């Protein structure tokens, strides 16, 4: 064997001279680079790979046809390689390459042996096909084919011929092995896990680089609607829990136990993220490097083709070689681009998992006060999305610079010193852009802060939508939100202008660099090299231009990442209980025994507490002991700090002095029920069980003890009833009962109840206390009796407490001890006039109720038995001891996606844009695209003229016009960007937000039964963010790229009819591809947006109930749930990104075919000049880049338009459900009398389109017939869930009556309220809701009180003084302008704030009427007589005089003022309607009576309808005629009582009359309250 046929093979070459037509490499070059170096590299990489796989478990069955085939072929290939090695030793001495031949065969044989071993381990212990084998076999296969051709052409003997035949056989073996190795092993796994269920988790490099693994998903999306639950899982490497575990290791200074440690040990968040995802971050580097090389090869291809056409002798082999080179280059570009983006997108979604999990975990570590100010929902949504958008072109930073350096060197070899022109311009633009980028971060932070405020405001409003509508604040809140939106858009102006500047700077190098370079070198550069120079400049400027455009998003992303880091650096709550010994202070009290040490639940020693470090003390000098297994009650006046003390024991409030010692039993779970019940948006049963183990008997026990059985039997879906966002679909009492039941169901050894009885009716309160806290109650009967703490205003139960703690108004402990001691020491407790336990216990605690109560309520013993039987029948216990609820399942949101026409979405988005602006935008884009593409054709004309015998124009002419075209293109690009950002984006964004939020504020409450808070928040967070940020950028990019693409296609068609003949085929192929793509991608876009709503809802739930969850040790369960929701949201988003790059791969393949067609055309037909070939290939070089950019921008645009589609669908859905918006607007003075009439009205919470059955559970109100006279004060009573709040909602137009309801069935002052616009109705009727709403953190006291901003400071101060709130505000730095912190207010103070807000509304209304009317209307202050003030003072002094002298509670007598009695009959005094929905549920009796006086004086002539559970106003303050009896004041505040039960009026009359009726239901309620002579 000598292969000595050609003497040129002995040289390095690389091109052989004088042999094989000159179209081949030398044999020496091939032996070195084809047969030696690649196998040697494989040997180096294979050894550590085998070592890493050796210890891994076997996960794939090796007894299969695939494994056998690979091993057999591997051994056959090894035998062949050994044979070739032996034959190589037979070479002649004259053959100078025999040594190189031998070394090549030794290395190749060794690599073949090692490949068999690698194949074994890769097959059995790796989920994917072997990447190292895929790359090695694929690369060496192409090299071996080329080498095999050379060997065949170099055969010089029979031995050479035999050698070549064996070598050909090894090539065939390697080809089959490459195919077998690339096959998936999915069906051969020993154990199937999430990786085997993923689409790409078991695929190899070939499948990944061609995206063939998406074929099943694409076909499925094309043929059928996609469902979220049908999407495949992500592979193990992208599991959230796995990623977060690694992320936590690198964020020790931010999260976990070391949170809050020394900041010097912290890594910047960007570094921590890079360290966590180091391998995913590095994987895209190799394909990106390959892409750089292939991209630069395009310039050499253009040079080779133009050189071939310029040559006189054109060899056919060279033409075929150019065609082959074109195939290799463009196939390589397509594959490397796909692999690069695949790995980079995986990194981005891994980063999203880490950041989202980190933000959620940090949220669980923060205090309630910190969470209220942080508004972290924006971080999880908007900021993370901007971080990912900024990191999208992360690898372009280094890749573009490397490519720029290489291309600059190539330009230097051709242009010498002139290469500095394009490079200098590029550097100058880069410096300018860096300067711009320095300012983007600051502007971006400002914008994000305003976005955060707006989203937090909307989230707060949506969480309290019922209260907003009841309070008539919908229009006011709408104005506030729209004002915040305008502020946000103004804040975005700086970022938008800088983005325009950055994008304009990015266009400068690409458009101006060719002009100045050709102007300087046109006389010295050969015309045939012009296209090569232009191509090289394009390779220099195009990636840098893309990089420049990425600077603004990158800086914005880094600014958002900095905001996230700031959030992660917040000080965590310092929990003083837990399993961490360093955080736990156990009780050590002298030499006491361990049993005695742990007989305490809590002990506070000289404790002082404050909400935040810089805030004043809310509790001070606290010394108390809460014993284990004892019942401790905490009482005190409104604002004394009862709730604060509960939070202090939980560790939620900062301890500034003293110690809090925690007993052993309180280290674990603590069941905490706050004043505002925390409920997640799930079923009632799920809220009660709440991650505890299911126990049927315990479940039934707690719902009976809590009184929930009565309500469950009357709800349509029973246990399976959805509670809605924040319990929207339930009454306040029902929400509280569920929270109580949850605490009872838990296995906690310590239970803390914060004012849980205040929102319950008298009978329910009595039932709850007797069955839960009483001597025979549930908590005292349990064998492991827990420590129970109850904060309450219901002081009648104090005699039954084991220990009593009394707080003073100054925030310290006034007294504490047992009842017997405190009731006789002359202190605060004795002044309450509560009767002793011997008088209370027989009737309250032992279940001896009054006969009138037992006989006249629907829930008798037999009813309760039937309720219990119904309850037990509803529950079906499955074999795994989990309960399921029979009956209709709650219908959740549908995950089937349908997409309406895309054009409709564009019309909806652009409807607010003027026609002039839209036409100008399109015209400027067309100008940009045409003048971008046409100069390349202009170069073709220049070359033709330059190569002709008689030139028509000088070079200056051609360069001048060439420069003019580029200048016009730059101007068109700038105008396109400016118009899109200003005239389109700002106008459309403002219009979309305004119309949709206004529609939601007008929507009926039934809408929020089907759409939860998280979903709606997602619309105004993620979707609006896409509309504001991503949509204008992607719209600009796509329209410009589309204009360029069409212009290039037109220019190419004009230059060659042959190329135009390919267009129909290319268009048909692209149409089919895009149609297949859109069917799937549009569904995935909607799913990706919708899948985030549950994640955001879960996040909002945790933020709202953080104290409850932290106390119950449930954060781990919620973290796991967050991980599940995060993974679900990742699936459609990740698959969408992959589908987008599948489309890019197909477009690159189409470009490849066009390039092959052009090269084939010019090399084979040879009737096209150099100009056509050069211009065509330059355009194709740019065309591929433009298509890639167009694909990305189109994908982003479609994603953004998916958000527009969702917003459009939401608007249409809301508008279709909204009623009453076409009604009338009555005169400003309406209602002037307050005459209310209801005639046979029934109503349901189901929308009017839903089927409603006429059953107890289906109707909220049943056949209500009611007439309320002007000026009448009506109290609505009844147990929780009886329909009291529903009646208020009906009067406000928020609850829809049945369609069968007749005309004029609901009238106020003679007008049917259904004919009045609902927004107007809520504004005209003043209402005070049970729960107070506040603006987000940062809003001042005055802004929260005077939402309209129409009152003076003196008016606001006057009202606050009347409500005894001014002293609280006066203590704040800044007074009314200081930031309000609602979490520092007690529930009673919050309710007083609501009353103050209503008083201000009434005064503003009176002022507006006076200004609009010529009638002089006396003001409230004029109607308030001096005698009333004196009488009020007398009442209070009388009360103080008898304190401590009577065994009855001292009640100030309410005497109505003369104005109140006469105002309703005066024509010059306008009345109205005031609705009070349990506004006094958290007030003590003295505070309640004081504010009834204020309401009476502030609202003269008003018809007042009040829902109340507080019946103390009806109890006489003198000696009762018999024990347990109650009477009403003859001249009291209320002159009419209505009792509701099951949605029906069961009693109606004057309080005195009803109390004197022996079987009165109202009398039964009052007797329940009278047994303690105190409010219930």
From Swiss-Prot:
The chain crosses the membrane at residues 27-47, 72-92, 99-119, 267-287, 289-309, 321-341, 387-407, 417-437, 500-520, 525-545, 915-935, 957-977, 981-1001, 1035-1054, 1060-1078, 1142-1162, 1171-1191. GO terms for cellular component: plasma membrane. CDD domains: ABC_6TM_ABCC_D1, ABC_6TM_ABCC_D2. PROSITE patterns: ABC_TM1F, ABC_TRANSPORTER_1, ABC_TRANSPORTER_2. One of its GO terms (molecular function) is ATP binding. Its main location: membrane. It is found in: Cell membrane. It comes from the Eukaryota. SUPFAM superfamilies: ABC transporter transmembrane region, P-loop containing nucleoside triphosphate hydrolases. The keyword ATP-binding applies. ATP binds at residues 636-643, 1278-1285. Keywords: ATP-binding, Cell membrane, Membrane, Nucleotide-binding, Transmembrane, Transmembrane helix, Transport. The keyword Chloroplast does not apply. It is a multi-pass membrane protein. Residues 602-834, 1236-1567 form the ABC transporter domain. Residues 289-556, 919-1199 form the ABC transmembrane type-1 domain. InterPro entries: AAA+_ATPase, ABC1_TM_dom, ABC1_TM_sf, ABC_transporter-like_ATP-bd, ABC_transporter-like_CS, ABC_transporter_C-like, ABCC_6TM_D1, ABCC_6TM_D2. It holds the Pfam family TMD0_ABC. Belongs to the ABC transporter superfamily. ABCC family. Conjugate transporter (TC 3.A.1.208) subfamily. ABC transporter that may provide the dual role AAL-toxin export and self-protection by allowing the fungus to evade the harmful effect of its own AAL-toxin production. Gene clusters encoding host-selective toxins (HSTs) are localized on conditionally dispensable chromosomes (CDCs), also called supernumerary chromosomes, where they are present in multiple copies. The CDCs are not essential for saprophytic growth but controls host-selective pathogenicity. This is ABC transporter ALT5. It comes from Alternaria alternata (Alternaria rot fungus).
